[in-house]
Amino acid sequence: MTKYQSDIVIIGGGIAGIVTALECLEGGKSVTIIDRDVAENFGGLAKESFGGMFFVDSPLQRKAKIVDSPERAFKDWCSFGELSPADGLAYQWAQRYVERTTAEVHDFITPMGISFLPVLNWVERGLDHPGNSVPRFHMVWGTGHELAMVLGSRLQSHARAKQLALG
């Protein structure tokens, strides 16, 4: 059995695990990622996905003259997801997500070379009760596979990659 020693242990080499590892390496921490698969297959379910990402008041929405806001997105999310303050952490998480997704996700990945098809998708509109009131789903150019490949490559080529162990 291999033994690892690091400041941070991350379970799972999906997108969240890869991004967490990148951030930890940036912070000077040593990192071990433990996954059921080999590093070449990291990316989790995102690697197999169509690549849709939910952003609020994004540059692509503004270019298309789609007026959106975190308040509007949260109202839509609560309607479609049937969330209320009684849902506690899920409700709070959804609120923070719509407030921060463009700045903390979109603006994090686009400098890495991730781009989006110039068409916004309007999913989860709701059949029996209202859902998204404007298009918010951005499709990664190259699908989720491209997202996983770009992030995985950034991880493997990181300046502190010697502080990274994959198990």
What are these regions (language model features)?
Residues 1-5:
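A short, basic/flexible loop-to-alpha-helix module at the beginning of a structural domain
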Residues 6-33:
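N-terminal Rossmann-like FAD-binding beta1-loop-alpha1 element of flavoenzymes
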Residues 13, 36-37, 57-58:
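Active-site-proximal beta-strand/loop segments in catalytic clefts of secreted hydrolases
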Residues 52-98:
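Glycine-rich active-site loop/strand segments that organize a redox cofactor
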